[in-house]
Design a protein with these regions (language model features):
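C-terminal cap/substrate-recognition subdomain and adjoining C-terminal extension
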Residues: 31-61, 65-149
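A metal-dependent, Asp-based hydrolase signature
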Residues: 1-52
Length: 149
């Protein structure tokens, strides 16, 4: 089993075993308590201003094997054009029912291509896989800076 799907499944199973509910709101709330390193909040405005001085529009994205709901709760979520991360599917009562998306080491490449081609919607797989001339791509790879951990 994929390790990320396993940890997401285990989160659901452990919550059930402990009589806890795993809902989106709970995970978003976890993100609100996330501590950021000094300077992280200010970094976005600084790099955006630097890009503007050079005539470059800067966009920020997250490609993470963490949980999207937690990242969305963080104090910097609004800085990102798109957040690609693991996320749950929720049933009609709002409970996490199954892993909806996992973003692992290998498929992070897919999300870099989404940014490259400007196809940010994860439901548009066919278009993502269609051939596209380089001069039609929204963000050339040469214009990307990828910072990883």
């Amino acid at each position: 089993m994929d390790g990320l799907l396993a940890y997401m499944y285990t989160m659901m199973a452990e919550c059930r075993a402990q009589g806890r509910v795993l809902k989106r709101d709970f995970l978003v709330q976890c993100g609100r308590s996330m501590e950021l390193f000094p300077g992280v909040r200010e970094w976005f405005a600084r790099i955006n201003a630097f890009g503007e001085r050079l005539g470059v529009e800067v966009e920020h994205y997250v490609l993470s094997s963490g949980l999207k709901e937690i990242i969305e709760g963080s104090g910097i979520a609004h800085e990102f054009k798109q957040i690609y991360a693991c996320e749950f599917y929720y049933d009609e009562s709002g409970l996490a029912a199954w892993p909806k998306l996992d973003v692992n080491f290998t498929n992070k490449t897919q999300f870099v291509y989404r940014i490259n081609k400007g196809i940010l919607d994860i439901a548009r797989d066919k278009e993502l896989n269609d051939s596209m001339p380089d001069d039609s791509k929204r963000v050339p790879f040469t214009n990307m800076v990828y910072v990883g951990d």
